[in-house]
Amino acid sequence: MQLKIKEIFDQDYTKLEGQKVQIKAWVRSNRDSKKIGFLVLNDGSSLTNLQAVYRVDKISNYEEITAARMWAAVAIEGVIKLTPTAKQPLELEVLNAQILKQSDEDFLLSNNDLSLETLRLNAHLRPRTNLFHAIMKVRATLAFAVHEFMNQNEYSWLAAPLFTGNDAEGAGETFSIQKFDNEEFFGKQTHLSVTGQLQAEAYAQAFGNVYTFGPTFRAEKSHTNRHLAEFWMIEPEMAFVDLKGMQDIVENLIKHVIKAVLEKNQQELEFLAQRNDENLIKKLQKVVDSKFERIEYKDAVKILANAVKSGHQFEDNEIFFGMDLGSEHERYMCETYHQGPVFLQNYPKDIKAFYMKLNDDQQTVASTDLLIPGVGELVGGSQREDNYEKLLKRCQELKMPIESLQWYLDLRRFGYYMSSGFGIGFERLVMYVTGVNNIKDTIPFPRSHGQIEF
């Protein structure tokens, strides 16, 4: 019978002793002597390798198999033999072996001491390392868990457009589409989208609960370990839900996806804990078990100011109401002050987007950021402004192009009672759950300023 390596180790493999199995896999290593050789095999189904023992008196092509290089593709037929006193609990006694495709001698990963930067420059090969195998397995589980949560809670998935005629965030950091045959292809200046939120609001007013989950683009000339030019966003939008209700949904979603990884990817997490953060699994379990605190922005400013007075040093020690909190301030709130996930809420309107609902104090908006230890901001969301006149006034104050946003304004004219939504940078979520330090290591082929290979 043909099996995956994961299938062998995930079952009671003692019952497999003496059984004949077929494996198709890649060679991780191959060592031999005159009479016996040892292949270490991996087929991508697990971080666990399978050792296959081949002998000169058992196979007719012994010399050919001794030449199988690292990452050669092979087909092996053999008998399972238990090895309880050895490092591995079982091995495969080879009866037949075939090299399906040899690997060239200059295979990069033959060098086991490669830096993360070298692997980023060779992103087509890095999934063959244990590190990126583990990261991408966790990423896949997180993505599935997002869709699972949304499906269980009756959200409809929306395929938001990637071309847009407006900058929804108002930050101006968009990629512009070049003219086609010396004319605007869409009849006006067009950009790659930075968010699917505006379109999600339109559908939420018909479906109730919707979400987008797809790529977004931001033209930031940043070379930090926290920024990408192309990244994925999870953006749910809910009609008839206020800020508090939205925070409850955020908390439930974050706990659901982390719990899914804890249940499905224990092997990968144990490897990543050894590689990145020895407390990784405890950290994730703490998030699942904790209650997310909620703190007013104005109170956070007081807490930070008191920290400075008590001798704590930030790079930016000038703390005042109206400031846009930096990553160091956010991390202080969730790592030092609260020591757990915390929602900051009701930010000053001047540092938030135009579409957020103005509070009764006329100074703040019904917005929230979820701060997570080790990352800082992971989720940003708000209750949307439902009053047509207030939204129009805010657009005018910010000198935004009313004509291209008129359809969005018009939603408020037709039963738009209440809507709230949030965005999660998917790669930042992967960073947190895997413990990696650079966001470029959380996406298969990273795109950032000056980098467009592959």
UniProtKB/Swiss-Prot annotation:
GO terms under biological process: asparaginyl-tRNA aminoacylation
Record keyword Protein biosynthesis present: yes
Catalytic activity: tRNA(Asn) + L-asparagine + ATP = L-asparaginyl-tRNA(Asn) + AMP + diphosphate + H(+)
Entry's localization field: Cytoplasm
InterPro entries: Aa-tRNA-synt_II (IPR004364), aa-tRNA-synth_II (IPR006195), aa-tRNA-synth_II/BPL/LPL (IPR045864), Asn-tRNA-ligase (IPR004522), Asp/Asn-tRNA-synth_IIb (IPR002312), NA-bd_OB-fold (IPR012340), NA-bd_OB_tRNA (IPR004365)
Keywords noted in UniProt: Aminoacyl-tRNA synthetase, ATP-binding, Cytoplasm, Ligase, Nucleotide-binding, Protein biosynthesis
Root EC class: ligase
Principal subcellular localisation of the protein: cytoplasm
Subunit structure and binding partners: Homodimer.
Family recorded in the similarity comment: Belongs to the class-II aminoacyl-tRNA synthetase family.
UniProt-recorded name of the protein: Asparagine--tRNA ligase
Source organism per UniProt: Ureaplasma urealyticum serovar 10 (strain ATCC 33699 / Western)
Gene that encodes the chain: asnS
